[in-house]
């Protein structure tokens, strides 16, 4: 019985420490990149909260391979019209082509331009303060499918 209780307590502590570590990484990421997201909101009318949320998820708080080696914080893949640098990475398929950026700010700017395509134009009728509407709208428009 003592072993079971010990295992449960240790498991709980491990999960708690992992969650605290993840939260600290998220907070550090937001602190580091919030001004870039705010600038993108000013320039392109995309909520900074949405931009940061997508970057956090896609880049693992800036720790993913794409983020660290290609400055790609949004997992944006190459398209036929992409003339910039590329980075090969196995995501859903082996050796897929992803966009590579000179710096993180370029990744954020390209993400904004990506969302300004026709596919997402309905989102721009929403207020930048309507983050829930933007989140639902991105899903409905097929973002990240």
Model-derived features: positions:
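Sec-dependent signal peptide recognition
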Residues: 2-10
């Amino acid at each position: 019985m003592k072993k079971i209780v010990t295992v449960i307590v240790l498991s709980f502590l491990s999960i708690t420490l992992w969650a605290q570590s993840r939260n600290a990484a998220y907070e550090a990421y937001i602190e580091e990149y919030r001004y870039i997201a705010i600038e993108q909101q000013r320039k392109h009318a995309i909520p900074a909260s949405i931009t940061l949320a997508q970057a956090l998820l896609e880049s693992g708080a800036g720790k993913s391979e794409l983020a660290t080696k290609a400055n790609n914080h949004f997992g944006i893949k190459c398209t036929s019209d992409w003339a910039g640098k590329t980075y090969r990475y196995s995501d859903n398929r082996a050796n897929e082509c992803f966009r590579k950026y000179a710096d993180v700010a370029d990744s954020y700017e390209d993400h904004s331009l990506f969302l300004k395509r026709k596919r997402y134009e309905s989102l721009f009728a929403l207020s930048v303060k309507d983050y829930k509407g933007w989140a639902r709208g991105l899903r409905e428009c097929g973002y990240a499918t």
